[in-house]
Every structure is written in C-alpha cells, then in structure tokens.
Amino acid sequence: MNDALADSGLVIVDKPQGMTSHDVVSKIRRTFSTKKVGHAGTLDPMATGVLVLGLERGTKFLAHMVASTKSYTATIRLGAATTTDDREGETITSASPDQLAGITETKISDAVKQFRGSIMQRPAAVSAIKIDGKRAHQRVREGEKVEIPARPVTISRYDILEIRRDAAFIDIDVEVDCSSGTYIRSLARDLGEELGVGGHLTALRRTQVGPFTLDNAVTLEKLEENPHVSLTLDQALAASYPVLSVSEKEASDLAMGKWLTPRGLKGIHAAVDPHGRAIALVKEQGKRLATIFVARPSTL
C-alpha cells in the first residue's frame, strides 16, 4: 500500500556558520525538489548546530515543536558591549584592563546564578521579533531605536565550562538549557551588564531541540549526496510525544477530526494505529480526547 506521507517528515540539519536559516530552507527545497519546506526555531548566521526542518506535511508539525526546550554551547566575551549583542555588531562600550582584573571567577559564578530559573529577559533588538508588523532587525537597520519589552523565559541549566583571561577581555564557555524564545545573545549582554563590564556572544552552537540532538543532524553536503528525511512523520510524532495506541476504528475517527472518549491523559500524546502509523496529536479537553494536529487526515 502506498503511503501518502512517504515524502513527509523532518530533516535535522547541522547548520553551518554564515548561512541564515532561510538560506538552509532554500537549499533543502532545491535538494528535495519541493517548495514545502519550513523550519522550527531560527538560528543566527553566526550560529551553528541543530536546525529542524519539515518537509511536505512535516511543515504542519513544526508548529507543535516551537515550544520545545533547546540546548546550546556558547562563548560569552566580557569586556565589551555591541549593538547586536554578538561579535558581528559594532562595539559601543569597552571595559578597562583594571575593571576586568576586578572580575573574579567567584563574581562571574555568582552573576550567572542570577539568570537561572524563571526570569524576565529583554530580547536582542536585532532579532526576528515583529513590532507592528515589521521585524525588529529591519527597524534597527533603518535607524530606529528599538526597545523590546522583557518576556518570561526559563533557564533550566546555565553552567560555566571554562574561563579564559586576556588583558582586554574574559571569555566564558557555557552550556545552556532553556525554554523556547530565549536569546543566548541576551544572556551574554545581561551577564556583562550585571558585572558592569559589558558582554556579547562570540560563538553559539545549538546542540538540541526537543528530543533531537546533533547525533540526529546531517550536514548539507551529506544531504546533497543522499537526500533523505531524518525522521518520517510517524517517527517524529512518536519521538516528540508519549505514544497512545489506538484501534483501527479510533484511528479512522481521529483522521476525520472526530473526538474520542477521554482516558485521563495529561498533556499531548501521539495517537498511533495498530500498524505503527502516527494518526494525530491528541489532548484531553474537558470531556473529549480531541485532535490538535492530524498527521493523516482522511482526505489523504
């Protein structure tokens, strides 16, 4: 039996430095000869690492991955603040060698602790956030002064790996686990402000998005040699959410958007039929077990 979703799924790319996330989407469109490609979670051109892309019906699933926890390794440079909060911006303040000499490892460690847990974070002005319909980075380039309100984020891990000193700066390698919407550039900026010497990001690598890690990621060169999805839509749903086994009849009902009798489930589950096919994402809403995303609608 032909599977209507045979070409649908996720491609996990190890994004190279220098490419925008949209550049990667364009490349994948050409590689797979399809226009139906999207990505979950923008990576700046400077950044490398895990970029999750959806193909065909997999693009519809991306909206349900946006809230995934993300992990990063990064290098924060203390001693200078920049217009973009990373190394690609212009320097706006610099600390003196004497100021940097007063920044002990204990002070750095204590400052980092202030940013663990649930915090309010002000996103970087040069970002993809829309303000009155226009991206913040566009407004900055046009000379506007942009101030984006702080928003709640959760930093579940913010660990110092190594501290390296120079007369003109202090580099700190860190590992961060955080909620979606967190800006690592903002963490660098805010750490520098907390210590009174300025700070910005000099390196960033995303190591995980939800359940998908660098072990799942493939380079663009490898994909060009052998185009293939990293996970089928069946595998993607089952990897991202707890599995709920359903009968043929229940699968048919879910495919038509019908609801099932609730079962006391908490959170979102991937409904999988007896053949191992992911039918839908479901969630209990009142007295219904309802679909929030149908992977295999009856119309396919």
Swiss-Prot record:
Top-tier EC class: isomerase
Pfam families (UniProt xref): TruB_C, TruB_C_2, TruB_N
Disulfide bond entries: none
GO BP: mRNA pseudouridine synthesis; tRNA pseudouridine synthesis
Coiled coil residues, start to end: none
CDD domains given in the database record: PseudoU_synth_EcTruB
Catalytic reactions of this protein: uridine(55) in tRNA = pseudouridine(55) in tRNA
Keywords carried by this UniProt record: Isomerase, tRNA processing
Enzyme Commission identifier(s): 5.4.99.25
PANTHER family found in the cross-reference section: PSEUDOURIDYLATE SYNTHASE TRUB1 (PTHR13767:SF2), TRNA-PSEUDOURIDINE SYNTHASE (PTHR13767)
Functional note: Responsible for synthesis of pseudouridine from uracil-55 in the psi GC loop of transfer RNAs.
Family statement drawn from the similarity comment of this UniProt entry: Belongs to the pseudouridine synthase TruB family. Type 1 subfamily.
Protein name: tRNA pseudouridine synthase B
The organism of origin for this protein: Corynebacterium diphtheriae (strain ATCC 700971 / NCTC 13129 / Biotype gravis)
